[in-house]
């Protein structure tokens, strides 16, 4: 089985204000080209797990593999590069820089990675925006576009470095049903047309039911996947 991401025996405690065992021996994998969702009540550990899987949180025990490479124990600098190159992330809030144009926002992760010339990055950013049907917004200031458009810009930004996996933490949480449907269809298209792997934390049962697989969490444990 070809896995893009694998977690083995992930364990995590929060130590303040008192000890809380938030993740308990979590093991599962995401296959190449799979669109998986994580569901569970608030406090079940799903967002905490996602932040570990995305390499943003390193305070855990267990092993994490990305593209069959063990990434647990790497330095923050190494992880930053691995994350920027391999993982696209879409949050509930878009985190766009309002004073920048749409195009400039999309370009930022590629500039940080530093593997392409500015001309190549501009070309790639336009391409991602066109793919999401928002190419006409490229020169607009990010503060001037609608909420649904902002989330599509955030997706374009997450895709700029051609990641191997796209992760989402409640990416439709702030959107109405029309824009939520838009985001779902974009994700489905990325899986079907580009073979992208996706892992999305969601409260939206309708969204989750239409993904390839639901990973159900309860009290820090995966109860079904």
PLM segments and residue spans:
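A short, proline-enriched helix->beta-strand linker immediately N-terminal to the Walker B motif
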Residues: 160-164
């Amino acid at each position: 089985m070809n896995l893009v991401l694998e977690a083995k025996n992930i364990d995590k405690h929060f130590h303040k204000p008192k000890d809380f065992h938030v993740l308990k021996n979590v093991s599962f994998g995401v296959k190449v080209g799979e669109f998986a969702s994580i569901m569970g009540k608030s406090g079940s550990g799903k967002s905490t797990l996602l932040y570990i899987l995305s390499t943003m949180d390193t305070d855990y025990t267990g092993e994490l593999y990305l593209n069959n490479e063990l990434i647990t124990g790497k330095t923050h600098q190494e992880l930053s590069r691995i994350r920027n190159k391999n993982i696209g992330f879409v949050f509930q809030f878009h985190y766009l820089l309002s004073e920048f144009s749409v195009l400039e926002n999309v370009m930022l992760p590629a500039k940080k990675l530093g593997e392409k010339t500015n001309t190549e990055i501009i070309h790639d950013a336009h391409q991602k925006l066109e793919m999401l049907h928002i190419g006409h917004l490229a020169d607009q200031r990010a503060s001037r576009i609608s909420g649904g458009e902002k989330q599509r810009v955030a997706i374009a930004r997450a895709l700029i470095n051609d990641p191997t996996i796209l992760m989402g933490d409640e990416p439709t949480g702030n959107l109405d049903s029309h824009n939520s449907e838009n985001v779902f269809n974009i994700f489905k298209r990325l899986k079907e047309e580009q073979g992208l792997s996706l892992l999305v934390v969601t409260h939206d049962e309708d969204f989750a039911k239409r993904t390839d697989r639901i990973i159900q969490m309860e009290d820090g444990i995966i109860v079904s996947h």
